[in-house]
Amino acid sequence: MTTLKNDRFLRALLREPVDTTPIWMMRQAGRYLPEYRETRSKAGDFLSLCKNTEFACEVTLQPLRRYDLDAAILFSDILTIPDALGLGLYFETGEGPKFHKTVRTEQDVANLPKLNAKADLDYVMNAVSTIRSALGGQVPLIGFSGSPWTLATYMVEGGSSKEFRFTKQMMYAQPEVLHALLDHLADSVIDYLNAQIDAGAQAIQIFDSWGGALAHREYVEFSLNYMNKIIAGLQREKDGRRIPVIVFTKGGGQWLEPMIASGADALGLDWTTPLNTARNVVSGRVALQGNLDPAVLYGSAASIEKAVKAMLDDAYANGEKTGYVANLGHGITQWVDPAQPKIFVDTVHEYSAKYLG
């Protein structure tokens, strides 16, 4: 394998010394970039973009050409697993993802096939290996999956939801059915992420996008427990290097203590949890990642710089000099001016020298 030229992202996740704060951005390959929109137009639709190795590689690399990022993240979708399980993923303009089939009964769960990620999601593995090769050791490649709870919400609801009516109905009225579904999904995610690691992913992020919709006990029982199972089942070393794992529960800042016990190397934060507070809670036991409000990127250069510096001041307030990766608190939005993320990235690298130099 090609020697990694810039490994500060991996080192920060493992709480090893770094020369400057590493940064990447959730959804860094996306609709805010004109070159992404052009490539998507060539592909014809979003799913075709994900399933074409050449296009998926191209859009993964696009933000790295514009910004001095410290990691690339596989361009794909969190709903590849439910699609491979036969639910029939499709997208309607302005309405987000939908499925032709839902999973709402014990029989529906029993009918789900066992996932063979290398065969059933070979297009993802082809993309990972192609991107890893194209990066040439420039920066590490992040692989990812949705959490079982988050995947289950889409499968039970039949698409996006704000209230999670059917999923929560299952949770309270038929918890054994939901547990069976979540267990099946945890096994699927383990297989999927290990296949990504075999294909070349050098770090893993689990996106628990809807974990924050749960109450405390339900979060632990129906979301965190299954992420714990996944982490325990992952390869943690490849080619002589540890494969760090990041858990990101949007709206999960109040659950840092139980998340620390998950076995993850790092916890992602959204913008509702102050970094200095989180640093004090974790006390160096895990790294942290985050947590600029993506809306900050709508502002002027001066306002972006001010917000980024305040974020870094919080991150290093307790004197720790590593164990931190800068990021947004959620995905970058399609309305951001492509010039603005450069201010974010460059300010992180330049200002963090004050603490790390």
From Swiss-Prot:
Function description: Catalyzes the decarboxylation of four acetate groups of uroporphyrinogen-III to yield coproporphyrinogen-III.
Sites where the protein binds substrate: 27-31, 77, 154, 209, 330
Subunit details: Homodimer.
Subcellular location: Cytoplasm
Primary location class: cytoplasm
Cellular component per GO, a single term: cytosol
Pathway: Porphyrin-containing compound metabolism; protoporphyrin-IX biosynthesis; coproporphyrinogen-III from 5-aminolevulinate: step 4/4
Family: Belongs to the uroporphyrinogen decarboxylase family.
Enzyme Commission number(s) of this protein: 4.1.1.37
Disulfide feature: none
Residues the UniProt record annotates as site (Transition state stabilizer): 77
NCBIfam families to which the protein is assigned, alphabetical: hemE (TIGR01464)
PROSITE patterns documented for this protein: UROD_1, UROD_2
Keywords, ordered alphabetically: Cytoplasm, Decarboxylase, Lyase, Porphyrin biosynthesis
Reactions performed catalytically: uroporphyrinogen III + 4 H(+) = coproporphyrinogen III + 4 CO2
One GO biological process term: protoporphyrinogen IX biosynthetic process from glutamate
Species of the source: Acinetobacter baumannii (strain ACICU)
EC top class, as a word: lyase
Full protein name: Uroporphyrinogen decarboxylase
